Amino acid sequence: MSILLYIKLGLAVICLLLVAILLSVPISILAPLGRVLNPGTGVWNSVPPPGVGCHSSVLTINDSSAAIVVCVTPDGFIRIASNETWAVFYEEGYLTAEYRLAQMYFMAMMTMGNLSSVVGPSVLPSDEFFRTLLTPQVTQEIVDSLNKSSFTYEALYYYTLGVNAYIESLTSQRMPIIFKVLGFRPLPWTMEDTFAIQQLLTWSLSGSADQLPFTVALLKMPKQVIYAFYPAYPSSIQYPVYPEEWNLGIYNTTGNIKGLSFYSPNPLPPGITKQEFIEAIDKAIAFYEESDTAFRDSVVSKLLPGINPFEHFVIGLSDEGSNNWVALSPSGQAFLANDPHLTTTVPSIWIGFQLVGPGMNVIGVDFPGVPGVILGHNPFIAWGATDAEPQVVYYYVEVTSPNHPGEYYYDGSWMPFEVVQEKIYVKGVGYVPYNVYLARNGVVIANYSGVVIVMNWTGMYPTDEGATFLYFDIAQNLTEFLKGLSYFKVGIQNFAYADRYGNIGIFAWGLYPIVMGGDPRAVMLGNGSYDWVGFIPTQYQPYVLNPPSHFALSANEILVSPNYPYYVGWVFESGFRADEIYTLLSQFEAQGNITYSSMETIQLNVHDYTTNLFLQPLLNALSTHLNRLSPIEVQAYELLKDWDGDFTPNSVAATIYYFWLWNYLNDTFMPWFQYYNITPADGLGEFSIFLGPDAIFHGPLILDLANWTNNYPNIVWFNDPVTGQSRNATIVMLLAFNQTISELMSKLGPNPSTWYWGRIHERILTSFFGINQLSVGPFPAPGDGNTINAAYGLLSNEGPSWRLIVDMANPLSGIGVYPGGISEYPLSPLYNDTTAYWLNGQYYTLIPPGLPQYFYYLYLPNATLPG
């Protein structure tokens, strides 16, 4: 195996150099060829970090000493135990750098807007994007605000020391290969770098731009179409995360909620035409897309083809989901399960740690570059997270005038735009000036012929989400958990909670902006009338604790019931995973079957709930028109008729249904978008509200279609306004079916028995740095974007990036798995050692028997700390 990997690595390096030559990459971007290929110091002379095993030592820092025991195990975990807390975090920093330095360094450089300093001018738009998000300023403010006597500061301080101790020890043999290719030696790590990774993650989890295309919809489409296509609350029945009864009738037929007015365009600045405004919106959309494209088309991306993990971080529009739930067994035991759906790479975006110190024994997964454990459990509590997906990004159009250059009209007076003067160092060029313009309600992202669009995001204010997880790591009860949760403000999550005392709950606390006018789903007038007036008070924020159903769940569906008194957003996942989880939990709870086995059954479930809504109407339509079907179409009908809705790799019906559902959705809505001149520049085909690639599992259109198909099959929206054809649901379903069979015959051949799902639907673990030869897979895969065991798209590198199940009555029995491995070094046996378990639906016992006794501290009565 080692020889094969050396061959792959050699081919990868050769490919890098050939691509560089063929693309005429500027020589200043790369290290000199002789240095890269030098047998003594180049890529050939690289050694992997240590493999599996345990060792003990005494660590001395600043005249303080601590006993340390470290175990690296083949289940994807690094285990650290010490008699001093500071030593645990120092060692975590050192070992994270040893196994993941390039990964964490590139994430931090990117988010600080410094990637051009290593890569060159091709990624300058990406750096400008993150400078526009004010990342350098925000991270500095966070560091300046830290309480230097706090537990969280101590953890961050010693973690940073540990990272830098490793960087200082770097030799040519241990230098990451990507650094050698680029001729780069890392600078010392800073606390700001850690918070930059925090900002990267919070933007990925909360950044959105749906308001931009929705504004175009409001301007181009009449009110009755907006009302039908984009209801303020989902048109189909959903199980909200927090089904609490509040004030009745909030989302009423007028769309009013707390003074808001949905479905009508917001006021425009004086003298601005609709067309000028639309062109400015299109420019704002292009701002995001250009930042994303700049990275994908950069030198790094060309040298390392296929790099995509950063793509979602840049544009912030990725809609990967997640699942979590908590449930009580008949004896009152609290179970927790969690599987966040993020990019699946090698190395993983996660790194597994068990951290043991005075009063602490926590195990779970962490983001490289951040101290502590992000998701996991300790002997007292367990927690997991899904993205709550509320709206925390708002857009405004400023009132400007040629008579007041450099100013905007706000709250009755003209005010100057604040200018933040940036200098971005670009490799091979030097310093490039870049100005960021700020108004009272956000940063300028587009200025088209005097039409100025600004964005306000809660993440542009200094908050310390990392403190949340450090306090979770040491929490021993609900009160201490809520203390940690109080620090989590941006990138709001549905935090699932279970403890050894039988408490269960889900909490979505954070900064929810309140506005008092207009339609916040669209760009609003920036004259001060529609600004944030505060945030939803904590006591009214969504949560559920010890529900009478004995379970609670979240899967990125709508947060609240329609009578919740505050606006929290409107573009969520479509709720089908949540519906399936609710169905299964209800069954298992009624059976008294809340066990590890039943929780695994739910996590690995591949039933697409949309088949409960669409399959029978399709079969009814086909059965009444069998005489019009071709022999192959009849064969496809028979396969669908006998199908259970499970997306297994060997299912042919799954393939037919998947393509049919896409065509049915497209055939219903695309004529209307064409009729009202919705264009790609407006976001057509990119955003879920305009038939983007996630539209069958995210956003309102698929819910509209389910509602109309089952309840209003003759509704006017099935008509084709372009041709004038009068249609109903049956006609469109048959049209989509005919298109699907023709498409599959063209793609897969004339024999439907060979159209099995695993033939066209695969999982791949892409190399984090995009070296295709070092990716893992692809593998035929079950599931789709609507199944609990999710695999988005046809070549999926998004899905359950971490699976956790724990019974808090016996937390030592907790199980989990993530794909990939500890090491980013491709020749290491720890590069890909957990993938087979993950692919096969298997789990590791997180704290297995046979470890040194220190790792059972706080679990077993006789276990002690080292020293």
Give short role names for the model-derived ranges.
Residues 488-588, 646, 661-665, 671:
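Hydrophobic alpha-helical segments
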Residues 125, 136-138, 160-161, 459-496, ...:
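Proteins synthesized as precursors that undergo proteolytic processing into mature forms
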Residues 78, 82, 86-126, 130-131, ...:
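Gly/Pro-rich active-site capping loops and adjacent beta-alpha segments
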Residues 357, 362-367, 376-380, 385-529:
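Glycine- and hydrophobic-rich flexible loops that cap the catalytic core of alpha/beta enzyme folds
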Residues 8-14, 19-334, 340:
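Substrate-recognition/specificity elements adjacent to catalytic centers across diverse enzyme folds
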Residues 659-751:
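Charged, long alpha-helical assembly modules
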Residues 27, 34, 291, 567-634, ...:
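Terminal end segments
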